[in-house]
């Protein structure tokens, strides 16, 4: 029986998931999104691989009604980046780096039950591994067990859960994934070893557990084409490593990191989705535009005509580049920091409604300021109600706060930014990259699948 299952998987993998975002296909329609219905979910834990195989990635995405990020918790780490919303601290004892290191309380099961009660049914767990692995990528057992415990908190509430690799790929000096620019092979070895252990730990979990390859990684200094080649190679290695682990990982739905999580850069034809079995890969990008409103309280109001039009333009870009070509999309992070509460709520509702209408799920970034993890209350209270409206399926236009046009400048946002912890570099040159000694290790390789 195992040989038959392996043979089936090998045949499916040869067909490819969606290797190129530029391929054409018939535009998506609602009946295609939901064709086949929604399979029953086994909240007790294990689900047969055949059930996971029958449920498409787009169905998974649409089942995620309201998503939420457990920010500033499991991704806590030492950082020497000044500002940019990463606490700049130097611990006296490296062992003190745990989920409370950036000021939030230890994660409890009660937190996820309260989130569920409020309407959240999907959670993304940003996890930084670099403080808990050795030089080969072997994970500290206690840390991996704690990660599993937190996963179980959410999973046992019936939530969808996304596990990701977080500040291991950020732009500070300890973000080891960026070393792939100089040492591709060794960095890839650490990366695949890390994911092999994570995959093995969670191999029996059903379709409500998803893995995300990495968070907002761009390879600064790699030079245009080379940066895309490196990311594409790592994403392919991620897929192949998980698939080769066996168990439910042969069919697990996987979330693929876009280039720097930036919509414009990811819609670039140089970005490629990895080869995989059909309908089991999902694209991940972020939306933090404009940065003066989303990342800092420099701009306190949002919602004039040009700002709304830019949001619509970017979501349409995702729709035509990926969704209409059979590639599901999740905006795994979005949020706002402007001081005007009405503007923040309007921004979140507008984005969520627009995405939902285009078959995209969204995950609110929360560093502890949106949902208080002690009192278990939303700030402002209207935020969660707005998200419920936006994901209700009802046809309506979110109501813009009064006087927004007078409070905001009628100017097109100049650039797209990343999640609130790191600002990505400017778009790299489009001209062909000339290889140097620093970047000429080896070309990214596509691993041969071991599953068949």
Question: For each predicted feature, which ranges?
Answer:
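Substrate-binding cleft of secreted/luminal carbohydrate-active enzymes
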Residues: 311-386
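An active-site-proximal structural segment forming one wall of the substrate-binding cleft
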Residues: 101-122, 133, 137-167, 175-210, ...
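Active-site region of glycoside hydrolase catalytic domains
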Residues: 42-44, 185-299, 314-337, 357-360
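Sec-dependent signal peptide recognition
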Residues: 2-10
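N-terminal carbohydrate-binding accessory modules
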Residues: 26-122
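C-terminal motif of bacterial Sec signal peptides marking the signal peptidase cleavage site
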Residues: 15-16
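Intrinsically disordered, low-complexity repeat and linker tracts
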Residues: 1, 20-46, 401-452
């Amino acid at each position: 029986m195992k040989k038959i299952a392996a043979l089936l998987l090998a045949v499916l993998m040869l067909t490819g998931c969606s290797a190129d975002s530029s391929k054409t296909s018939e535009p998506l329609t609602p009946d295609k999104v939901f064709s086949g219905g929604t399979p029953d979910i086994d909240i007790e834990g294990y689900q047969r691989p055949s059930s996971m195989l029958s449920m498409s990635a787009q169905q998974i995405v649409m089942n995620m009604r309201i998503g939420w990020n457990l920010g500033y918790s499991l991704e806590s780490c030492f950082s020497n980046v000044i500002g940019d919303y990463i606490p700049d601290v130097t611990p006296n004892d490296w062992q003190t780096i745990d989920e409370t290191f950036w000021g939030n309380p230890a994660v409890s099961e009660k937190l996820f039950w309260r989130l569920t009660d409020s309407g959240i049914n999907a959670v993304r767990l940003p996890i930084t591994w670099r403080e808990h692995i050795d030089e080969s990528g072997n994970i500290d057992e206690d840390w991996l067990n704690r990660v599993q415990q937190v996963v179980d908190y959410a999973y046992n509430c019936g939530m969808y859960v996304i596990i990701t690799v977080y500040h291991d790929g950020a732009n500070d000096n300890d973000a080891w994934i960026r070393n792939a620019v100089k040492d591709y092979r060794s960095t890839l070895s650490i990366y695949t070893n890390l994911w092999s252990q994570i995959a093995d730990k969670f191999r029996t979990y059903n379709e409500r557990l998803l893995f995300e390859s990495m968070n907002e990684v761009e390879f600064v200094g790699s030079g245009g084409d080379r940066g895309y080649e490196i990311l594409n190679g790592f994403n392919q290695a991620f897929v192949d490593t998980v698939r080769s682990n066996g168990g439910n990982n042969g069919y697990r739905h996987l979330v693929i990191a876009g280039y720097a999580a930036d919509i414009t850069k990811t819609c670039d034809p140089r970005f490629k989705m990895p080869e995989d079995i059909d309908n089991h890969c999902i694209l991940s990008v972020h939306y933090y535009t404009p940065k003066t409103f989303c990342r800092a309280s420099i701009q306190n109001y949002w919602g004039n005509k040009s700002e709304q039009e830019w949001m619509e333009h970017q979501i349409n870009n995702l729709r035509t580049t990926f969704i209409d070509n059979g590639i599901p999309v999740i905006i795994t992070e979005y949020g706002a920091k402007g001081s005007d509460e009405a503007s923040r709520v309007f921004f979140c509702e507008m984005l969520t409604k627009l995405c939902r209408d285009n078959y995209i799920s969204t995950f609110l970034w929360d560093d502890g300021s949106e949902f208080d993890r002690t009192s278990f209350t939303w700030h402002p209270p209207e935020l969660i109600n707005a998200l419920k409206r936006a994901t209700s399926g009802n046809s309506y236009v979110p109501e813009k706060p009064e006087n927004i046009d007078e409070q905001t400048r009628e100017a097109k946002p100049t650039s797209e930014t990343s999640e609130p912890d790191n600002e990505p570099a400017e778009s790299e040159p489009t001209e062909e990259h000339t290889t140097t000694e620093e970047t000429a290790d080896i070309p990214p390789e596509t691993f041969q699948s071991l599953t068949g």
